Design a protein with these regions (language model features):
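N-terminal small/polar loop signature for handling phosphorylated ligands or for N-terminal nucleophile
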Residues: 29-90, 163-219
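Gly/Ser/Thr-enriched, mixed-charge loops and adjacent short helices
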Residues: 15, 89-201
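Short beta-strand-to-turn element immediately C-terminal to the catalytic PLP-Schiff-base lysine
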Residues: 95-98, 217-221
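Loop/helix-junction capping segments adjacent to catalytic residues or to phosphate/diphosphate-binding pockets
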Residues: 10, 39-40, 66, 155-159
Length: 227
């Protein structure tokens, strides 16, 4: 990962996607992205590289990394277009194979030129995740209706976090839902989270996510808690 257009180009993305395809025994790969402006271009390039190499693509659209990781286990592989909590101009590829992140040997395969099979062109499918329903069953219903404020930070947790919390019985308010209007940066651990701090003074708890939804900061009684 790195600054898009400088450290990471579309040529790099195409190369890495094609090379990754040789590791996919299932011939199926889940794709998801966070909300970075460069995400759409990179996603389409990843799809092209995989499908050209005979891999069927299962597109989750914008989704948090934990959701995409779980779906990747079902299909055998996944590529998540994100640079996590890094600055907006950054982007990257998180790759999942057989339910795990890539190891050193697999990374070497991805970086170095490969000759993937071109026996057929892969197909593209739009998919949705059962993550919210499954997680809600595990958590169960919360009886006392806690008041929760969720600071999306303009990221991929937008729909997933609020829907899950509401499903288990929380009274949910969301702030910074839209990427273009977010009052803070992509990393909640380094931000003051002033809007969330103010908002949670009369609520039970606040949660702040990073752009790909795998990093969380908690605010209680108007005070940011160190992770």
């Amino acid at each position: 990962r790195g600054i898009f257009g400088k450290d990471l180009t579309l040529r790099d993305v195409l190369k890495f996607s094609k090379n990754f395809s040789v590791l996919i025994n299932s011939k199926k790969c889940v794709i998801a992205t966070d909300t970075r402006p460069s995400g759409h271009m990179i996603t389409e390039t990843v799809k092209a590289g995989l499908m050209q190499s005979g891999i069927d693509v299962y597109d989750l659209g914008i989704a948090p990394t934990p959701v995409a990781f779980r779906e990747s286990r079902k299909y055998g592989a996944g590529i998540i277009i994100t640079s996590s909590h890094n600055p907006i101009e950054w982007n990257g590829l998180k790759m999942v194979i057989n339910g795990k992140g890539v190891n050193e040997k697999q990374l070497d395969t991805i970086i170095n030129e490969q000759n993937p099979s071109k026996s057929k062109i892969g197909a593209e499918y739009k998919i949705e995740s059962d993550y919210i329903d499954d997680a809600a069953k595990i958590i169960g219903r919360i009886s006392d209706i806690p008041k929760v404020t969720v600071d999306i930070g303009g990221g991929a947790a937008k729909e997933f976090s609020s829907q899950l919390l509401e499903k288990v019985g929380c009274d949910v308010i969301t702030i910074n839902s839209d990427f273009e209007k977010s009052s803070r940066g992509p990393d909640p651990t380094t931000d003051t989270l002033q809007e969330l701090v103010v908002n949670t003074k009369n609520r039970d708890i606040g949660f702040a996510f990073d752009l790909d939804g795998d990093r969380l900061v908690i605010v209680i009684n108007g005070e940011k808690k160190n992770p």
